[in-house]
Amino acid sequence: MLKRLAGACLLLLIIAICSGCSSLAYYQQAVFGQIELLSKKRDLVEVLSDVSVPLEVREKLRLAQRLTTFAEARVGLPVGSTFDSYADIDRPYVVWNVVATPELSMIPKTWCFPIAGCVSYRGYFSHEKAKLFAHTLRQRGYDVAITGVRAYSTLGWFKDPILNTVIHYSDPELASLIFHELSHQMIYISDDSIFNESFATVVEQEGTRRWLENTGHPDAIIPYQTKKRRQQTFISLIMNYRDLLSEIFGANQPDDWKRAQKQILFGHFKKEYKKLKHQWNGDSTYDAWMSRNLNNAHFASTGTYYHYVPVFQTLLADHQYD
């Protein structure tokens, strides 16, 4: 444990030297948030033998073990010591990401870091600190979204644990998460969030499909496929309106006209979602997303994960899904 803490503190020192003091407070919360996570890690073997741990938690962790084995053997993902431990951090999200766009643009603001490169979000281990940062961005005229994140990859810098934040996931959801995060250890391009997340999304989808088909879960395939079809329909709706908003913002018109058209489009978007929900027999999966005071940042953050998905899906099909 002391070795891990020393390593994290050294990392903070290196980052501070590279970045200057102006960003030191942000890096401090990032490093000490990671230290907190590391301090709560327990080896999976230890947790699985601890009868004081709820049975449903141990069963989900056993599934995680099987999933990492499958990820390495059947999906070709690098596993190593990733997900061979468990951490209960006693909160619903591990970090909160802040995404911001100009009021009349769909291009997200980026932040650059020594390790991850430039990314279109800024993560906080504290919800309150995320909200404070979001407030400063709003005061500067940005559209801002805060999104809770249940897991993330340190890209092999640390041995990432399974977190309590995902223990309630269904089996296919946990499979998707594990495949997604492991894919970042296979390929991660600095300064290209859209490529990285789109690639991970396709690996997640294909890996989960293979796992369901190869591990005797026929009863889960149809519900999973239904969920993914609805997800794709909803994402397509978001991407369509993102493009419409981009057209409005690029038009040779006054800013007041653009602002008015933006609100009109948000109204149309909500109406189309209501139609989808009716077609889905009242499925409320995306109600929480829709309940927010929608702005450009919500549409931009979704685009990060799905922009190149059709391209990667085509490449996968061209190579016979191998």
Predicted regions and their residues:
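Bacterial Sec signal peptide processing site at the extreme N-terminus
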Residues: I17-R42
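Acidic/His-rich structured neighborhood in mature extracellular/periplasmic domains
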Residues: L67-Q231
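Bacterial N-terminal signal peptides that target proteins for export
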Residues: M1-C9
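Pan-zinc metallopeptidase signature
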Residues: S236-D322
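Extracytoplasmic/secreted proteins, especially bacterial periplasmic and envelope-associated proteins
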Residues: D43, E56-E59, L63-R66, K129-L132, ...
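Amphipathic alpha-helical packing elements
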Residues: Q34-A71
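Bacterial N-terminal signal peptides
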Residues: A8-S19
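Acidic/histidine-rich, surface-exposed loop or edge segments in extracytoplasmic proteins
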Residues: L38-V53, W111-V119, R292, V309-P310
